Amino acid sequence: SRGLGDVYKRQCPYSAIVKHVRPCVRACKAEAIYIDKETEKAVINKDKCISCGSCVYQCPFGAITDKSSITQVISLIRNSGNNKNYRVYAVVAPSVASQYTDIAPEQVMAGIKALGFYDVVEAAWGADMVAWLEAEELAEKRFLTSSCCPAFVNYIKKGFPELAENISHNLSPMAQIARWLQEKDEGCHVVFIGPCIAKKGEVKYTKTKKYVDYAITFEEMQAMFSAKGIDVASMDKAQLGNASCFGRIFARCGGLAEAVKEALKEQGVTEEQFGLSAVSCNGISECKAALLKKQKGLLKENFIEGMACEGGCIGGPACLSHNARNTAQVNAYGRSSAESSISDAIKAFRDEEKK
């Protein structure tokens, strides 16, 4: 800041101890942003950028923005003819539980449906499926890195390409539940709503784009609420789906590893057959440390849970709230689940398939 710079100037008139680092450069743990010496403008190195959105959140001037699909989503809903021409589903990230201080997740879900969606589905249900499949894959391959966070996946592919073969082959929770919706309701359209800017890139992946039409953020969701005059605080509570506690806590760091551990237990995998030893990386700096250890053959753990955002998805750049209560809110959301296990959630999922 200028005040701090003035202090340094008084202490050292030669500016020998003054170092100005722009917020975007400081925020980019992937080291993808640099200052052009001639123009003095910040430049993003696309070969290093992982689309985590940290620079977007930290820039005080709004000089860096993500590409919005809000108008396309509105058109998609309008052209559905009240979901008679085709149905539009909203898949909502479990970090929805931490977006508002005194508003229940069920009220937010009701507000989203009031935007014109045919139904609102928990991405956490997809997380249950991913935890189950990832546990099976891990027990077979003996080492994996998670695939749920697209920014973490990008970081491996760009920074540690030799480790890319260890990335889980499973779809993300968003894509997993969207695929189920497409199979259940042929011709439907799916919109993901969450805290993540990197998801906007993920929906363009070859294996994802056939399931998810658009990804918008919680900030864009709130803009749609405001535009349509929806006061979520006054909404009646909508009925939530059948995601388990373990699927819902994917939203915070450590939740994915806990879910995989539970899935291994429910699958009857004993410690003798395979003992899970996970490292949960809280932010890109910790991801880098774990990947460097793996690269050098020094990593003792057999599963890397990578979260590009500190805190996990609850620390995403497009969250409406960033405070100490967020983890507790997500944990409470998990405890409110009607399903006590991942297998119960998957059974409910299979029962829903038969309808």
What is each of the regions a protein language model found here?
Residues G3-Y8:
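Short, small-residue-biased leader/transition segments that mark boundaries at the very start
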Residues I35-D36, D66:
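Short beta-strand "wing" residues that participate in macromolecule-binding interfaces
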Residues K9-A30, D47-F61, S147, G194-E202, ...:
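Local cysteine-cluster metal-coordination motifs and their immediate loop/turn environment
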Residues K37-V43:
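Short linker/helix segments within small regulatory modules
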Residues K19, E40, I50, I103-A104, ...:
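Residue-level recognition of alpha-helix initiation/capping sites
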Residues D66-K355:
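Iron-sulfur-associated redox domains of electron-transfer enzymes in respiratory
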Residues A27, E31-Y34, D47, V120-A127:
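Charged, flexible boundary elements
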Residues S1-R2, S15-V18, L144-T145, V153:
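Non-ligating segments of multi-cofactor redox enzymes
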